[in-house]
């Protein structure tokens, strides 16, 4: 035991964070990730070795987990095995208890409250007695508490096992009975022990399996639970799990495995899944449960984690008679719509199609390992976003794990090796002694029932109906309708008309600089109070354009059937290919066999806003009555023949949400679908909101009518005739609009990492800004609304205000333009207005304090725009003299510029910003796109005119200046990220998201790719460059931790920052980032600028930094993590007052983007996305760049003004430094002098009056600890080779725990020689299983050879050298059919060679720039976003080859003639090798591969060249179409015949 002093110390330091939950965090916001796997003996031979191997495997994945604030208490580790009867028998014998073989006995592994031990055991025993089960006995689990970390120890439950038996039930019957028993126990304890119920938890209660787990590190699990290393603890299988949680509050029950599953990943759709499961409960029936089904409810629990809830859903299905494999197929389905293999196995797609109408997918990155004690298996999510490698041995072991090499197997004992692909499953049936692959499992499950016949009987597919070909209302009435429903001129011209013309969403630039809807004096429609949420860190966004094969907008409407039916029956329903339906399609639904109720959503104004809620309640009652009358489609419609001033439409979002939740509460939600027929829906955000709150389909009749009027306008037809607009007919215009909305919807889904509309439907993945609890609880229950806002009455009044404008006495010929998007005099206030910009330009160009004071006054006297405008400062201290305040220099060091890329900005602007920031000791940020090495030099040749030959295009220079950005960004495209780039940084920023478009990637158009930009980005001029929505090496929190490790590895002196965007739940994400060893966390507000972004993203994604920063600071402080990181904030900072307020909320550093550009010369023309910037700031056109007049001095002056203002405010508050006020929220009070036009219901409690925590300021750089590269660099011969540029060769053993090998060595070389200068040769030979990121950022002159296998990210960012990977000696399996390297290899590689004698995983060569490689098979998405280099694949390829590929060449051997269907042909074309140059390029690489690896496959191809050459395909993007390797017109030698 710990001694008392240690316990007291731990209590003093930690108890506050352990016993009090954060005000800003709940379990729903907690995120986790992990390492997971299983070992199973196919022959079901139980032995102790399997348990020991599982514990060792767990230890080998310790790096995938994390620890609590004490750095010792693990976030969780655990193991599931068969029940070790021999061990228990010997222990129970001492108590006189004998267990007979094959007796029906269950074992409960229990966490019991130490203070209520006897009370809880009494409840358990009473329930068992009620259920006619005998309590055989109790067993205290032997534990060693000393090995626990402090937090884990302080929160340790009492761990005891309970044995019970049945005299009349079979084992399977007892297993089902124990499910009922557990639910009953939990319910009784919830009623009788409310105060301590949270301390009670059933790890497992089964007659087949048992779970040992807890809040501990991997190595501690077997030390704590003494049973696990007992020789009599035998099992034929073991599942193991190591957890990485974003939260540090110790929760023993959240450790995994759960009762049936272990889960690595995150369920993005959790809230929707919970809502739908609750709504599904009234329908649940099963003969197994007879009349006791209600005792199982609730099935899920919003207070549990996503993994626990998925486990509960799996448990329900298994206990109700489904196999474990079938349960997972139903809940986590494969992407079946675009699978060529299913064309021959339609029964599988029929199965998935059938269940898509009953159960929405639990969507998100997931490797799920599962067992019911009879079958052990694993399945991967539809996108394949988690790694899963397997080995099958000759002695019949199956090993599946997140990483290869965690279980040691002799090479000669390996029968086969592989990986699970997207949506695939593997299982081991230990009863029938079978290993089942994906096809066998799914064919077996799907073949049991004729699902195709059931679909034919019950499903109607809604065919496309023609759009109206004529206008339905006259122009005058149209404008009145548009006004009544809240349209503005911008909505029509910038949104609807653009979409009708172009078929895509409008793009805009800069950011959202108008007041939040709740702060605005102008009326806003309800949608404007909702902000879209998005994926960052804990799960990835998806690319809806390049990965459309996994996405679908399909939805089914009608009555839902019972999920538990043992004889499947599907209710009549209609399948829609899209939730956006036109008037004809709505009529077709009305005329279908389904019963439809048309419910009007008009309320009468004469009763006043007071009656608003009552009339919506009447609407809800009408909906439930319609269902009880037999209707299974509810059409909520605001369509009225006559528009009247006294009859106002209930906002459709309010109507949808209110009816949706009302029906859930009444138990009727599954009986009908909701369709919205509305005029008030036109932007993609509107559609997303309606679907998110329960609508299955929307008919936006007024938007379609607006498109028809636009097409009919003579001006439109004239522009079409002149070619200034694309020509289309009236129906095509409406189709274009619909197409744009659908594409926008897919983007909104994908930015949250969701693939299917059915998973987004009802998921409520939004954050509310400006609605009070009355409104939220009524119609949007479960959605976070942190700041309160409008009451029902106030919302009713705003609704009436919008409607009444349609009946104004003032007659106009055009719709009102309030300037919500573009600044206009008299319109909505924009912070970035001409008056402000002019004052700032005048202030900084000559350091004029008078003009700065004018600038300051303009911002101080603005209308309330941001949340901070509602606050004011209050200090109990006396003011001090300004000379007592910290120096200007100290303050300036805390300033940074935002990450603005060279490419979006001109070279002149980018370098001017960097020079200015270096002068003041601040930090500029490179943004994405690399940096010219010339900028790393210090200027010493500046003449009296301020010019330098080194940077001749700049003005106002000084000797000693440097244009190197102190912060180098690593974004998803990895453009220009080389070893030299990384080594010339003081900080390395991982950009996860951008404030103006979080969850989205980017695209730099070809017209901005000048020769200079192309050189930096390692691509060809004029070729568009795509930055993926996610980092393809960050799909989870432990992946981010790995990238942080990689960057600390190459440059151990640089701090690593992670840029996040403010949203609800960011605190838990930040906690995970801090635990992942980041040095800096940056929180960006929603109002940050951008060079180009969809308009709907600028307006509707992200939240204010005030909320995000406060949440992050508070949660980190409460969880003892605040001293691990520096917090930086950006997004609309413009004054010293902003800096002080941000510091009080927790910020220590401050980023400036838009305002820094304005100070440097930007005039806010807001045309950045066009490449036509009139002042040369945001363009690559040379004639426009020549107009750039900015000099570093102007930006220096701006920051001097800001710094001086900060010092003045600090002095007035009585504080000497920013550090003294950091996180001191008590200095903020609500400014009661400000009265908002709309409400007095704003609540700022999350920003003010918060407990102040103390912490030690973080200054140092985190380290990776001892690593293999340190040992390599400690070898004198290696050092000599670097110093003298000699050749040296060394040999090493390697394990999966040796990560990022070769990278620190590469950093040392790049620091000394740059990317190209090293002329020596360092050969390193390894034997074993390499950890992640083997050879990442490899430098020229370093050759790595591995005899064994490697995990994910091989060659990530490599710039030179070579990586050769071959199977170990003694292998007898066929090399080319085995997986030898993991996922996402060669990501962002800028050079070098990779030869792998085996298959690669998913996303091979993603965003490859210049590397060349040969591998012998690849998974899905090979060569995605590739911009250069050459890839050869000598084996099978997965789907979606070449998606987003704009450069480079790839050759694929197609022996089965199936390759063409696997190519994404949106950009690339596929052809045979038709020129001698192409043939020679291919042959040379294969010859190299053969020579380097000894590949038999390569040797055979070369020996039979004329036979194999015709079987190769060449994948050619447009940029490579006219070169000698691809085009006979450019080649002197062509291949005329084979």
From Swiss-Prot:
<comment type="pathway">
    <text>Energy metabolism; nitrogen metabolism.</text>
</comment>
<feature type="binding site">
    <location>
        <begin position="1109"/>
        <end position="1166"/>
    </location>
    <ligand>
        <name>FMN</name>
    </ligand>
</feature>
<protein>
    <recommendedName>
        <fullName>Ferredoxin-dependent glutamate synthase</fullName>
        <ecNumber>1.4.7.1</ecNumber>
    </recommendedName>
</protein>
<dbReference type="Pfam" id="PF01493">
    <property type="entry name" value="GXGXG"/>
</dbReference>
<comment type="similarity">
    <text>Belongs to the glutamate synthase family.</text>
</comment>
<dbReference type="Pfam" id="PF04898">
    <property type="entry name" value="Glu_syn_central"/>
</dbReference>
<comment type="pathway">
    <text>Amino-acid biosynthesis; L-glutamate biosynthesis via GLT pathway; L-glutamate from 2-oxoglutarate and L-glutamine (ferredoxin route): step 1/1.</text>
</comment>
<keyword id="KW-0285">Flavoprotein</keyword>
<dbReference type="InterPro" id="IPR050711">
    <property type="entry name" value="ET-N_metabolism_enzyme"/>
</dbReference>
<dbReference type="InterPro" id="IPR013785">
    <property type="entry name" value="Aldolase_TIM"/>
</dbReference>
<keyword id="KW-0408">Iron</keyword>
<keyword id="KW-0314">Glutamate biosynthesis</keyword>
<dbReference type="InterPro" id="IPR036485">
    <property type="entry name" value="Glu_synth_asu_C_sf"/>
</dbReference>
<keyword id="KW-0150">Chloroplast</keyword>
<dbReference type="InterPro" id="IPR029055">
    <property type="entry name" value="Ntn_hydrolases_N"/>
</dbReference>
<keyword id="KW-0934">Plastid</keyword>
<dbReference type="GO" id="GO:0009570">
    <property type="term" value="C:chloroplast stroma"/>
</dbReference>
<keyword id="KW-0274">FAD</keyword>
<dbReference type="GO" id="GO:0016041">
    <property type="term" value="F:glutamate synthase (ferredoxin) activity"/>
</dbReference>
<feature type="binding site">
    <location>
        <position position="1162"/>
    </location>
    <ligand>
        <name>[3Fe-4S] cluster</name>
    </ligand>
</feature>
<keyword id="KW-0028">Amino-acid biosynthesis</keyword>
<keyword id="KW-0411">Iron-sulfur</keyword>
<dbReference type="InterPro" id="IPR002932">
    <property type="entry name" value="Glu_synthdom"/>
</dbReference>
<feature type="binding site">
    <location>
        <position position="1173"/>
    </location>
    <ligand>
        <name>[3Fe-4S] cluster</name>
    </ligand>
</feature>
<feature type="active site" description="For GATase activity">
    <location>
        <position position="34"/>
    </location>
</feature>
<keyword id="KW-0003">3Fe-4S</keyword>
<feature type="binding site">
    <location>
        <position position="1168"/>
    </location>
    <ligand>
        <name>[3Fe-4S] cluster</name>
    </ligand>
</feature>
<keyword id="KW-0315">Glutamine amidotransferase</keyword>
<dbReference type="InterPro" id="IPR006982">
    <property type="entry name" value="Glu_synth_centr_N"/>
</dbReference>
<keyword id="KW-0560">Oxidoreductase</keyword>
<keyword id="KW-0288">FMN</keyword>
<dbReference type="Pfam" id="PF00310">
    <property type="entry name" value="GATase_2"/>
</dbReference>
<comment type="subunit">
    <text>Monomer.</text>
</comment>
<dbReference type="GO" id="GO:0019676">
    <property type="term" value="P:ammonia assimilation cycle"/>
</dbReference>
<dbReference type="Pfam" id="PF01645">
    <property type="entry name" value="Glu_synthase"/>
</dbReference>
<dbReference type="GO" id="GO:0097054">
    <property type="term" value="P:L-glutamate biosynthetic process"/>
</dbReference>
<dbReference type="GO" id="GO:0051538">
    <property type="term" value="F:3 iron, 4 sulfur cluster binding"/>
</dbReference>
<dbReference type="InterPro" id="IPR017932">
    <property type="entry name" value="GATase_2_dom"/>
</dbReference>
<dbReference type="GO" id="GO:0046872">
    <property type="term" value="F:metal ion binding"/>
</dbReference>
<feature type="domain" description="Glutamine amidotransferase type-2">
    <location>
        <begin position="34"/>
        <end position="431"/>
    </location>
</feature>
<keyword id="KW-0479">Metal-binding</keyword>
<dbReference type="InterPro" id="IPR002489">
    <property type="entry name" value="Glu_synth_asu_C"/>
</dbReference>
